Amino acid sequence: MQIFVKTLTGKTITLEVEASDTIENVKAKIQDKEGIPPDQQRLIFAGKQLEDGRTLSDYNIQKESTLHLVLRLRGGMQIFVKTLTGKTITLEVEASDTIENVKAKIQDKEGIPPDQQRLIFAGKQLEDGRTLSDYNIQKESTLHLVLRLRGGMQIFVKTLTGKTITLEVEASDTIENVKAKIQDKEGIPPDQQRLIFAGKQLEDGRTLSDYNIQKESTLHLVLRLRGGMQIFVKTLTGKTITLEVEASDTIENVKAKIQDKEGIPPDQQRLIFAGKQLEDGRTLSDYNIQKESTLHLVVRLRGGMQIFVKTLTGKTITLEVEASDTIENVKAKIQDKEGIPPDQQRLIFAGKQLEDGRTLSDYNIQKESTLHLVLRLRGGMQIFVKTLTGKTITLEVEASDTIENVKAKIQDKEGIPPDQQRLIFAGKQLEDGRTLSDYNIQKESTLHLVLRLRGGF
């Protein structure tokens, strides 16, 4: 049968062989054709180097298969190239080879176009025109191959030490793949890595797109330390943060981990355990803090204060503000926390809609005041609700809102429980389960609110 032998220069040789021929026989045929001594030949098939004593049929080499011929150069050397999948490729090179040559050899072995290859050695990306000796790459050195993916993207991974790693990924990569890439770059075993995005720990089997991680997103890397332990930190808002620590960590270290997770500067953090405020220079073991202990975090505000923002869904957000903050600033903080664009936010306090240019102190909003957040819905509309006292309330609604939703909005604005509200439109009492569009209620329609008094009829 015929087989083909392709050299690194791109030349293809055709050989007549039998399935029972040994690799040694094949090398002798190549020597006959090309004059290359067998001891300088290495034959590769399906990514495997072929051994002299084995036959073509041992390797399932059939007619018209293509082998790759790599020359074992006198005065040359072997180097290794490790891919992000953990596969290691062996290359025959000379110190005078350029990075471009090396990429061509990788293409020959693996089929990866040079323009998709990035080679890393000692943490440095290697430039095409430089040679291996320029980078002091010696025999049996290991290079790392990162694919510059078409349709790929870059993301950043920030460690607790503040170091930022750049990774080439695709949206379809699993978290497991990402951890393998981090291992490749940093040497940290995947089982010691915890990746956090938007406050959530990422699960190995899920993909980046599952978590809506897009190009240039930043993940946070927390090490799950062997011999380490987990502790919990509870904030005044009731949120619980999980930290990976060691008993030898100082309180200062713990505050740095909290900053990394929550963005709260250490100088604004006070940590309490067993009723004691913890001092920066002491360790967790000094205070006998053991695995799964819970610390309490109190935020020491710079001349600031906490306020609460309650949404129509009943969720309460805690914000750190100053009395001099404008309503615009407050909306920006809400956007940071909740992702709601300021132009969709309406803030209500004491029944008044707050104007962007005014400050909290203008409205006498003090510490621990509660604002109400109403969304100004795109594709939404305003309607009016008139009470028997003659007061008119403005609501932001959508035609698909149920009467129940509308009553919840009225409760949010006016504090009147839904079960005390009766809404009338066009002389009809409106039923909870129906929508505004069911009743043909359009923008700027006026509903009438009648109170159903407790104990009344």
From Swiss-Prot:
Annotated keywords: Cytoplasm, Isopeptide bond, Nucleus, Repeat, Ubl conjugation
Highest taxon of the lineage: Eukaryota
InterPro entries: Ubiquitin-like_dom (IPR000626), Ubiquitin-like_domsf (IPR029071), Ubiquitin_CS (IPR019954), Ubiquitin_dom (IPR019956), Ubiquitin_ubiquitin-like (IPR050158)
GO cellular component, one term: nucleus
Cell compartments where the protein resides: Cytoplasm; Nucleus
Coiled-coil boundaries: none
Ubiquitin-like domain segment(s): 1-76, 77-152, 153-228, 229-304, 305-380, 381-456
Positions of crosslink type Glycyl lysine isopeptide (Lys-Gly) (interchain with G-Cter in ubiquitin): 48
Further remarks about this protein from its record: For the sake of clarity sequence features are annotated only for the first chain, and are not repeated for each of the following chains.
Function of the molecule: Ubiquitin exists either covalently attached to another protein, or free (unanchored). When covalently bound, it is conjugated to target proteins via an isopeptide bond either as a monomer (monoubiquitin), a polymer linked via different Lys residues of the ubiquitin (polyubiquitin chains) or a linear polymer linked via the initiator Met of the ubiquitin (linear polyubiquitin chains). Polyubiquitin chains, when attached to a target protein, have different functions depending on the Lys residue of the ubiquitin that is linked: Lys-48-linked is involved in protein degradation via the proteasome.
Family membership noted in the UniProt record: Belongs to the ubiquitin family.
Protein's name according to its UniProt entry: Polyubiquitin
Protein source organism: Geodia cydonium (Sponge)
